[in-house]
Amino acid sequence: MAQKRPACTLKPECVQQLLVCSQEAKKSAYCPYSHFPVGAALLTQEGRIFKGCNIENACYPLGICAERTAIQKAVSEGYKDFRAIAIASDMQDDFISPCGACRQVMREFGTNWPVYMTKPDGTYIVMTVQELLPSSFGPEDLQKTQ
């Protein structure tokens, strides 16, 4: 299947704002166990930005990633159409990449929207949700019958 470019192409100033917001969100991370703060900034179709950070728990499986925090905040306020998400960490040498669970949650809300994966110096790479999670299972698959 041919890959499509993101349905939403953001203006450079919008990308920059999203990157800054993801860095700001990282400052709120609660990560006393991993010491690995992550921030995310999610842009809705309406232009709102929802920030999220990772929140760990002594019962490790109960922690939540920054991306899912941002998405859950947006959905809980009635937003379900997303234009882009930016993710930030303190990794100097590598771009932060969403985990598999976050990729699946992002996919719930579409495949053709951009994910900006950053470094602290402001550089980034961008991929669509489809590129991050090819051949994925989504809501429309539940409607298929044999």
UniProtKB/Swiss-Prot annotation:
Q: What is its EC number?
A: 3.5.4.5
| Domain of life according to the entry | Eukaryota
Q: Which cofactors does this gene product need?
A: Zn(2+)
GO BP field: cell surface receptor signaling pathway; cellular response to external biotic stimulus; cytidine deamination; cytosine metabolic process; negative regulation of cell growth; negative regulation of nucleotide metabolic process; pyrimidine-containing compound salvage; response to cycloheximide
Q: In which tissues is it expressed?
A: Highly expressed in granulocytes while expression is very low in fibroblasts, chondrocytes, monocytes, and T- as well as B-cell lines.
Listed under subunit, the entry gives: Homotetramer.
How is this protein named in the record? Answer: Cytidine deaminase
